[in-house]
C-alpha cells in the first residue's frame, strides 16, 4: 500500500495498491515513475474539467517541464473508478538531460524492479450481470488466480474471499459443476453485482496480491465504441517505449473548443475548472502543484514522459507520413492497432496555444468507419511505420513498377499535371520550447525523413494506374516550371548546364560546375534515357544521373525518369567529378535488397579476385562464385556482368555494382 502526504489538505490519505490500481486501469495505462521528468500540458488538463476553463490573460506556456514528486493511487468511493494524484514540481528547461531516467526507471518508463502480478479480467455477459444469476469463471482464472480447488470433493466447492479497492471483503461460493463442467461463482455474486451496479459490458478483475490475498476490481466499459463517445482510452507512456495510445478529439468538439475557449469535457470531465487554473498558476510560478488523473474517463493524458515528447518533436512531421496507433476495444478485452496517415500538421488552437504540440497531427485512418471521430492525435502517441513504404523507392524495384516517359513533352505534361503540394513545416521548429532540441538534430537526418512516398502515401500500383488512365494533360509550357514553394533554384554559369535540386531549408552554396546536367524531383533522381532534341538546337549531349543533395542548382528539360535512392552528401562538402558524383575508380555497391549503398575504391584493387574478396568482406557473404552474382552499370548506363571485360576497363567505367541475393535474378534494376 502507498501512503503519500497531501500538502494541500494537510493530512494523510490511504492509497490503493499500485498493482491492483493498474489491473483496474487497464493494460494500456502507464504511469510515470517517481522522480521521472514529464511535460505538463495545461491545455490537456483543461480538457479533463467538467466545466469551461478560462485562463484569462495568464501567461501560461503550452508545456511545463516537471519532476514527479509523488504518486497516490486511489479509487472513487461511489463508482470504484480508479484515479491517481500526482504531485509535480516545475523545472527549468536547462535541467532537462537527454536519456535521463528516474530512480529505478528503465528506458521504457517503468520501475525496473517491479514484477507483474498475475491478474485476469473478464467482460461481463448479460447472464453474468443478471440479478440473481451467477458468474461463469474462465478456467484460467479459476486455476491460476483463485485458491486451489479440491477436485476430489463431490462437488468441488469452496468459499473465496476477495478484497475490493476500498479494502472491503466480499464472500463468494466457488463451485465446479454442470455438463460440461465449469467454474461458477454463485452465492454472494448477485449481491456484488447489485452493490457495484454492474452491467453487461463492464469488466471484473481478479488479482492475486503479493501477500496471497485475492483482490477484485471493476473496469467500467467505455460507451460509444473505439475512439468514440465521451470516454477515451488514454495512456501515460508507450508500451515498450515505442508506441502510444489514444489522446483523441472529435472534430466538432475541437471546433467548438476553439470558438468558445472552453474545455471539451463539459458534462464529461472529472475535475473542476478552478483546480486546473490553480495547477497552471502554480506551475508557471515554479511552485509544486497537484493534478488528478482518471485513466478510464479522461480524454487524454496531460503529463507526458519528457523523453517521449522530446523524441516525438524531433521528427520533422509532414503530411503523408504513415503510422500505427493502439486502441483499447470498447469492452477493454484487448488492444488493437490501427494504421493511419498524417493528413496535416498544424496547431490545434492557434489563438490560445499558438506554439503547442498538443494534438498537432491531423490524421486519416485506413479504417475510417471504426475511427471516424478521431481527427487529431498527439505526436508522441503514434509509432511511425518506417519500414512500410507506400512507394517502393529501392534501387532494385521491378521494371514493371517503373514509369518511363519516352518523350520530352510528356515529362513537361507530367510536371504540369501533378498538383504541387506545399510542404508543411513543423510549426514548432523555431517557436516552441523544443526548438533548441530540434536545432541539434543533424540536417542530414532530418532530410532523410522527407521521402516522396511520405508526402503522398500512394503505392506504386496506384501511381501506375493514375498515369495510364489520367485525362489528357494541357499543352506543355515552353519551359519546365516548378512552384517556388518547393525551394527550386536555378543557377546558370555561362554556357554550362547546372544542377537541379529541391532544397529543404538548407543553406545555399556555390556548387562545383559539372559538364552533365540532371534534375531531382521530390528528393529523387530523374534519370533521362533518351537525348533531347529540339528544332534548331545543336545540343545533343546526353543527360546522365547524378547524386541527391540537399542544395544545388536547376536545369529544365529532361526526357525520362527513374526513381532511385542515394545516401550521398551535399555538393557543398565534396567535389563532383562526374555524372554519378564519384571520382574515377570509385563506385557504389548495393545489395539487391538494400536502399543504401557503400562506396568502394576500385583503384586499390588489381583483379577480379581481389574484388570478389573485398565484396565478401564488406557484406559478409561467402560465395564461391561471387562475380557471377555481381551486375554493374558503367558510365554510359549499360548494365553488364562483372568479369565480361578486362579489369582495367571495368575499373574505368564501373559506377554502380549490384550483388544479387539469388542466382538468376535477372529482373533486377541496377
UniProtKB/Swiss-Prot annotation:
Polar residues bias: start-end ranges: 545-557
GO biological process: auxin-activated signaling pathway; cell division; pattern specification process; response to auxin; root cap development
InterPro entries named among the record's database cross-references: ARF_dom, ARF_plant, B3_DNA-bd, DNA-bd_pseudobarrel_sf, PB1-like
Disulfide bonds: none
DNA-binding region per UniProt: 120-222
GO cellular component, one term: nucleus
Gene3D superfamilies named in the record: 2.30.30.1040, DNA-binding pseudobarrel domain, Phosphatidylinositol 3-kinase Catalytic Subunit, Chain A, domain 1
Domain remark in the UniProt entry: Interactions between auxin response factors (ARFs) and Aux/IAA proteins occur through their C-terminal dimerization domains III and IV.
Family: Belongs to the ARF family.
Protein name per Swiss-Prot or TrEMBL: Auxin response factor 16
Organism whose genome encodes this protein: Arabidopsis thaliana (Mouse-ear cress)
Amino acid at each position: 500500500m502507498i501512503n503519500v502526504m497531501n500538502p494541500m489538505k494537510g493530512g494523510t490519505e490511504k492509497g490503493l495498491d499500485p498493482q491492483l490500481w493498474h489491473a483496474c486501469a487497464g493494460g494500456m495505462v502507464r504511469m510515470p515513475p517517481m522522480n521521472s521528468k514529464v511535460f505538463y500540458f495545461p491545455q490537456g488538463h483543461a480538457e479533463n474539467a467538467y466545466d469551461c476553463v478560462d485562463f484569462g490573460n495568464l501567461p501560461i506556456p503550452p508545456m511545463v517541464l516537471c519532476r514527479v514528486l509523488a504518486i497516490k493511487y486511489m479509487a472513487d468511493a461511489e463508482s470504484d473508478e480508479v484515479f491517481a494524484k500526482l504531485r509535480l514540481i516545475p523545472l527549468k528547461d536547462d535541467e532537462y538531460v537527454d536519456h535521463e531516467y528516474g530512480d529505478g526507471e528503465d528506458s521504457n518508463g517503468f520501475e525496473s524492479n517491479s514484477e507483474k502480478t498475475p491478474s485476469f479480467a473478464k467482460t461481463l455477459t448479460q447472464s453474468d450481470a443478471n440479478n440473481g444469476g451467477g458468474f461463469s469463471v474462465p478456467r484460467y482464472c479459476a486455476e491460476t488466480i483463485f485458491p486451489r480447488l479440491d477436485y476430489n470433493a463431490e462437488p468441488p466447492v469452496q468459499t473465496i474471499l476477495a478484497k475490493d479497492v476500498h479494502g472491503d471483503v466480499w464472500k463468494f461460493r466457488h463451485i465446479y459443476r454442470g455438463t460440461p463442467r465449469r467454474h461458477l461463482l454463485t452465492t454472494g455474486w448477485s449481491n456484488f453485482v447489485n452493490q457495484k451496479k454492474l452491467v453487461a459490458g463492464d469488466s471484473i478483475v481478479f488479482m492475486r496480491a503479493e501477500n496471497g490475498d485475492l483482490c477484485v476490481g471493476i473496469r467500467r466499459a467505455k460507451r460509444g465504441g473505439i475512439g468514440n463517445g465521451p470516454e477515451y482510452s488514454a495512456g501515460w507512456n508507450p508500451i515498450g517505449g515505442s508506441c502510444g495510445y489514444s489522446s483523441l478529439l472529435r472534430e466538432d468538439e475541437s471546433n467548438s473548443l476553439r470558438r468558445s475557449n472552453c474545455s471539451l469535457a463539459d458534462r464529461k470531465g472529472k475535475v473542476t475548472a478552478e483546480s486546473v487554473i490553480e495547477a497552471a498558476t502554480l506551475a508557471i510560478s515554479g511552485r509544486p502543484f497537484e493534478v488528478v488523473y482518471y485513466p478510464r474517463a479522461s480524454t487524454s493524458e496531460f503529463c507526458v514522459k519528457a523523453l517521449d515528447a522530446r523524441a516525438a518533436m524531433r521528427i520533422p512531421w509532414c503530411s503523408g507520413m504513415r503510422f500505427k496507433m493502439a486502441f483499447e476495444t470498447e469492452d477493454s478485452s484487448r488492444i488493437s492497432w490501427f494504421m493511419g496517415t498524417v493528413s496535416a500538421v498544424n496547431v490545434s488552437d492557434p489563438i490560445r496555444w499558438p506554439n503547442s504540440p498538443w494534438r498537432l497531427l491531423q490524421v486519416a485512418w485506413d479504417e475510417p468507419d471504426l475511427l471516424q471521430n478521431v481527427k487529431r492525435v498527439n505526436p508522441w502517441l503514434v509509432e511511425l511505420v518506417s519500414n512500410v513504404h507506400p512507394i517502393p523507392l529501392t534501387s532494385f524495384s521491378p521494371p514493371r513498377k517503373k514509369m518511363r516517359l519516352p518523350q520530352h513533352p510528356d515529362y513537361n505534361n507530367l510536371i504540369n499535371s501533378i498538383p504541387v503540394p506545399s510542404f508543411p513545416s513543423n510549426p514548432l521548429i523555431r517557436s516552441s520550447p523544443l526548438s533548441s532540441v530540434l536545432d541539434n538534430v543533424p540536417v542530414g537526418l532530418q532530410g532523410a525523413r522527407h521521402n516522396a512516398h511520405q508526402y503522398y502515401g500512394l503505392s506504386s500500383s496506384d501511381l501506375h494506374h493514375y498515369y495510364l488512365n489520367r485525362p489528357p494533360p494541357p499543352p506543355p509550357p515552353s519551359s519546365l516550371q516548378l512552384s517556388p514553394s518547393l525551394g527550386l533554384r536555378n543557377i546558370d554559369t555561362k554556357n554550362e548546364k547546372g544542377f537541379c535540386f529541391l532544397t529543404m531549408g538548407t543553406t545555399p552554396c556555390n556548387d562545383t560546375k559539372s559538364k552533365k546536367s540532371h534534375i531531382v524531383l521530390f528528393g529523387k533522381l530523374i534519370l533521362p534515357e533518351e537525348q533531347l532534341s529540339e528544332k534548331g538546337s545543336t545540343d545533343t549531349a546526353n543527360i546522365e544521373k547524378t547524386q541527391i543533395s540537399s542544395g544545388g542548382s536547376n536545369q529544365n528539360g529532361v526526357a525520362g525518369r527513374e526513381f532511385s535512392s542515394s545516401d550521398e552528401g551535399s555538393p557543398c562538402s565534396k567535389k563532383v567529378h562526374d555524372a554519378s558524383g564519384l571520382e574515377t575508380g570509385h563506385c557504389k555497391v548495393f545489395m539487391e535488397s538494400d536502399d543504401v549503398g557503400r562506396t568502394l575504391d576500385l583503384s586499390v584493387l588489381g583483379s577480379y579476385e581481389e574484388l570478389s574478396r573485398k565484396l565478401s568482406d564488406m557484406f559478409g557473404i561467402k560465395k564461391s562464385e561471387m562475380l557471377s552474382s555481381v551486375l554493374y552499370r558503367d558510365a554510359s548506363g549499360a548494365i553488364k556482368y562483372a568479369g565480361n571485360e578486362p579489369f582495367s576497363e571495368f575499373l574505368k567505367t564501373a559506377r554502380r555494382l549490384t550483388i544479387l541475393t539469388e542466382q538468376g535474378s535477372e529482373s533486377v534494376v541496377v
